[in-house]
């Protein structure tokens, strides 16, 4: 034993001095740690406000990501296990009472941060969006697995737009708001760009969100409601259409709109499936464009070294399937027409085409009435909808889908409304000259070529279509306008065809199908004459289709319905780009 080591106990004063020295040393260490944390936060984290220039904001966030990587942290984790979706969380725990916090429940959610506020350095509130619903996340240092400095440092780095994963327990705050009280908290995918600010007093917040037992439902717009895109958080049309993901993120009505589009398509499929129609798929590229009057897109097949046309319609293929024995077929898919773009036309659009053996255009009018009136009633709860037909600055009109729909005979109505006579032999040169004179008389513009088909189409648009607000069938088109339709039984020169117009726009085109191969070849020959006159929308001769008809097409009715225009009506949309997720846009 070393006699130089003293074993005498320290005096009380010495103990006090030693205790004070340790406390002072600990305090200095805490100050240093806090200073280091503060410097790290200033160096690596973005400021809480969004006042920075967007370019600087992006640069700062990129530095933050790189800093995390240098620290050995993956800023984009591979996996986060969630126990339920946010809508399921709301449904399951909406019954909790104010101030009730069942801490024994361990669950996890994930979603996008759409708002954030700090009550103090130890308490943060987030609004988490996912699955069309939003819920509050309450992050408290008390529930955290790290100390207060680390907690504050981490929370300061979480920004609006970040996708986060939260594990915790449910509860209702003192204000009665359902929340998840966070324990572990992880950023799964940072949002590097500055998001538009949500206007807390906007129409979106005050009238487009509903409160249910203290929970805010976000995507609460329903079909039949009016819309006003001017009230959106993100309002610039170009940005909304070019960056649809941002539009969906910021504007809950837009998400609800596209859910409605999906419901429309689902309703059509269910309706037709219940009638024992078979859904099929047909080629999008072929040597001919298909059965419609439109200008096609052209592409080149390298392997075959041949020019191919992108389909304007699947009509001829579908009728070949009826020849083959599929008595009821339909196709829901994309069509392409290399023509102009405006508020109701897109070069890429969605159609439903169906063909029904042993049916005629009268049967299809009944089917169309049942389908559309039933759909409107199912989606909106009424046969009547309101629609801003004349723009958002004017009062909406009412459109009534109550069956039966009105029927108008095309030529009889045209003669009556315009007080003119229409020659019955419309294939003659004299008839063409007469229609040119009529168009000039009423100042009806018809760009060349002045084929009889185009002249009639312009006159019908000028005198009849403009008055078709409620669903209206325009029926019995001339043969010269309908190369694939069967002649009318009682009136030679006319066909068993109808167009359905709603709000002055064509929604459906249907007819009793021409199944006589000899007559079909003659009709194609008439179309060739129009093409030689410069009408590039006239149909080409399709020999393979004529051959199919020679094997025998049963009496058949066919219908085409525009999904985009139908969706416009049921979502109060005035621009077709509103209802197409990624619409065609002009080059910037």
Swiss-Prot record:
<dbReference type="GO" id="GO:0005524">
    <property type="term" value="F:ATP binding"/>
</dbReference>
<dbReference type="InterPro" id="IPR004365">
    <property type="entry name" value="NA-bd_OB_tRNA"/>
</dbReference>
<dbReference type="InterPro" id="IPR045864">
    <property type="entry name" value="aa-tRNA-synth_II/BPL/LPL"/>
</dbReference>
<dbReference type="InterPro" id="IPR006195">
    <property type="entry name" value="aa-tRNA-synth_II"/>
</dbReference>
<keyword id="KW-0547">Nucleotide-binding</keyword>
<dbReference type="InterPro" id="IPR044136">
    <property type="entry name" value="Lys-tRNA-ligase_II_N"/>
</dbReference>
<keyword id="KW-0067">ATP-binding</keyword>
<keyword id="KW-0436">Ligase</keyword>
<feature type="compositionally biased region" description="Polar residues">
    <location>
        <begin position="1"/>
        <end position="10"/>
    </location>
</feature>
<dbReference type="InterPro" id="IPR012340">
    <property type="entry name" value="NA-bd_OB-fold"/>
</dbReference>
<keyword id="KW-0963">Cytoplasm</keyword>
<dbReference type="InterPro" id="IPR034762">
    <property type="entry name" value="Lys-tRNA-ligase_II_bac/euk"/>
</dbReference>
<dbReference type="GO" id="GO:0000049">
    <property type="term" value="F:tRNA binding"/>
</dbReference>
<dbReference type="InterPro" id="IPR002313">
    <property type="entry name" value="Lys-tRNA-ligase_II"/>
</dbReference>
<protein>
    <recommendedName>
        <fullName>Lysine--tRNA ligase</fullName>
        <ecNumber>6.1.1.6</ecNumber>
    </recommendedName>
</protein>
<dbReference type="Pfam" id="PF01336">
    <property type="entry name" value="tRNA_anti-codon"/>
</dbReference>
<dbReference type="Pfam" id="PF00152">
    <property type="entry name" value="tRNA-synt_2"/>
</dbReference>
<keyword id="KW-0030">Aminoacyl-tRNA synthetase</keyword>
<feature type="region of interest" description="Disordered">
    <location>
        <begin position="1"/>
        <end position="54"/>
    </location>
</feature>
<dbReference type="GO" id="GO:0006430">
    <property type="term" value="P:lysyl-tRNA aminoacylation"/>
</dbReference>
<dbReference type="InterPro" id="IPR018149">
    <property type="entry name" value="Lys-tRNA-synth_II_C"/>
</dbReference>
<keyword id="KW-0648">Protein biosynthesis</keyword>
<dbReference type="GO" id="GO:0005737">
    <property type="term" value="C:cytoplasm"/>
</dbReference>
<comment type="similarity">
    <text>Belongs to the class-II aminoacyl-tRNA synthetase family.</text>
</comment>
<feature type="compositionally biased region" description="Basic and acidic residues">
    <location>
        <begin position="20"/>
        <end position="47"/>
    </location>
</feature>
<dbReference type="InterPro" id="IPR004364">
    <property type="entry name" value="Aa-tRNA-synt_II"/>
</dbReference>
<dbReference type="GO" id="GO:0004824">
    <property type="term" value="F:lysine-tRNA ligase activity"/>
</dbReference>
């Amino acid at each position: 034993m070393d006699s130089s080591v003293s074993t005498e106990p320290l005096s009380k004063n010495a103990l006090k001095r030693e205790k004070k020295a340790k406390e002072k040393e600990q305090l200095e260490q805490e100050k240093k740690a806090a200073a280091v944390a503060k410097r790290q936060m200033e160096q690596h984290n973005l400021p809480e406000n969004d006042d920075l220039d967007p370019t600087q904001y992006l640069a700062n966030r990129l530095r933050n990501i790189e800093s995390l990587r240098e620290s050995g942290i993956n800023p984009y984790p591979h996996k986060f296990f969630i126990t339920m979706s946010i809508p399921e969380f709301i449904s399951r725990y909406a019954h909790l009472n104010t101030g009730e916090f069942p801490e024994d429940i361990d669950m996890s959610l994930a979603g996008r941060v759409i708002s954030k506020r700090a009550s103090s350095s130890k308490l943060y509130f987030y609004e988490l969006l996912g699955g069309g619903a939003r819920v509050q996340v309450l992050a408290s240092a008390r529930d955290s697995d790290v100390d207060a400095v680390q907690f504050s440092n981490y929370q300061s780095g979480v920004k609006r737009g970040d996708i986060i994963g939260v594990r915790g327990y449910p509860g209702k705050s003192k204000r009665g708001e359902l929340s998840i009280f966070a324990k572990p908290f992880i950023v799964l995918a940072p949002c590097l760009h500055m998001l538009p600010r949500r206007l807390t007093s906007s129409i979106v917040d005050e009238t487009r969100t509903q409160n249910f037992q203290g929970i805010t439902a976000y995507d609460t717009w329903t079909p039949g409601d009016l819309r006003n895109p001017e009230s959106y958080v993100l309002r610039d049309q170009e940005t909304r259409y070019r960056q649809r993901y941002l539009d969906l993120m910021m504007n809950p009505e837009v998400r609800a709109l596209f859910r409605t589009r999906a419901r429309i398509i689902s309703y059509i499929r269910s309706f037709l499936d219940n009638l024992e129609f078979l859904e099929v798929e047909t080629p999008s590229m072929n040597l001919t464009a298909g059965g419609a009057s439109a200008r096609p897109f052209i592409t080149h097949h390298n392997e075959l070294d041949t020019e191919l046309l992108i389909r304007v319609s699947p009509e001829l293929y579908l009728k070949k399937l009826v020849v083959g024995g599929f008595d009821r077929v339909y196709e829901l898919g994309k069509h392409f027409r290399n023509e102009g773009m405006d508020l109701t036309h897109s070069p890429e659009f969605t159609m439903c085409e169906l063909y029904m053996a042993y049916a005629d255009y009268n049967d299809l009018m009944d089917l169309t009435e049942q389908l559309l009136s039933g759909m409107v009633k199912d989606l909106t709860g009424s046969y009547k909808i309101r629609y801003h037909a004349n723009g958002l600055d004017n009062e909406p009109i009412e459109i009534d889908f109550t069956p039966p729909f009105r029927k108008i005979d095309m030529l009889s109505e045209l003669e009556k409304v315009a007080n003119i006579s229409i020659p019955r032999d419309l294939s003659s040169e004299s008839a063409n000259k007469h229609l040119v004179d009529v168009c000039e008389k009423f100042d009806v513009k018809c760009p060349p070529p002045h084929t009889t088909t185009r002249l009639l189409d312009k006159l019908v648009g000028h005198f009849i279509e403009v008055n078709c607000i409620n669903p209206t069938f325009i029926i019995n088109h001339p043969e010269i306008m309908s190369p694939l339709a069967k002649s009318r039984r009682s009136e030679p020169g006319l066909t068993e065809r109808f167009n359905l117009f709603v709000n002055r726009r064509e929604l459906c085109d249907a007819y009793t199908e021409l199944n006589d191969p000899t007559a079909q070849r003659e009709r194609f020959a008439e179309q060739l004459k129009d093409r030689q006159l410069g009408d590039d929308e006239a149909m080409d001769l399709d020999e393979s289709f004529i051959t199919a008809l020679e094997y025998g097409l049963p009496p058949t009715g066919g219908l085409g319905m525009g999904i985009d225009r139908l969706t416009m009506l049921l979502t109060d949309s005035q621009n077709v780009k509103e209802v197409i997720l990624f619409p065609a846009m002009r080059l910037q």
